[in-house]
Amino acid sequence: MNDTEKRKKKMKVLLVNGSPHKDGCTYTALCEVSEALNEQGIDTDIFWIGKKPLSGCIACKSCMKNNKYVFHDSVNEFLEIAGDYEGFVFGTPVHWGGASGGITSFLDRVFYADLNGGGNRFLLKPAAAVMSARRAGTTATWDQMNKYFGLMQMPIITSRYWNMVHGANPEQIKQDLEGMQVMRVLGNNMAFFLHCKNVALKMGISMPKQEPMVFTNFIR
């Protein structure tokens, strides 16, 4: 499918649930973002990374040849469909003041495989991170999550506050009225960006020219 055909299709955003709980607090926050996107004419799907252990990258370099991982798990399942989406929202619970171990291994491998395998699934596609916590650690987790998007040239979508919700269960999350509003504003802002990008492409504004990557090691 070429760029023109893609622009004629309805735009889609994939929301990734990085919690071991399929229908828990993180899911509740993502659903609020999803509903806001839907109201603005953007289709959405939710992808759960699952609760099975996810290995970190083992530096085998197989992704450079196959554009996927040597382990067949939810990472490869995600890579197979990621190119069909125009934007991404990654959700995670806060574990020990940072992102969950599952989503950390998941994103390490997803972006490394795409970058080294030449998949080009994420270039200039908007991304956002959503954090769910009982109490603290959300801002440190947000910083951690945004680093992935910064390396992949993914515009980072924000809300009117940092993208976090608080509560120990879905019912408590829904009582975080400000947090839920932040989720809705986030969805609206991502929809606005996607519509603006779509108009720009229709008007003939080209994507930025990509330069060959240059690597400079910190050796001095």
Q: How would you describe each model-predicted region?
A:
Residues 52-82, 215-219:
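Cysteine-cluster motifs in flexible loop/terminal segments that predominantly coordinate metals
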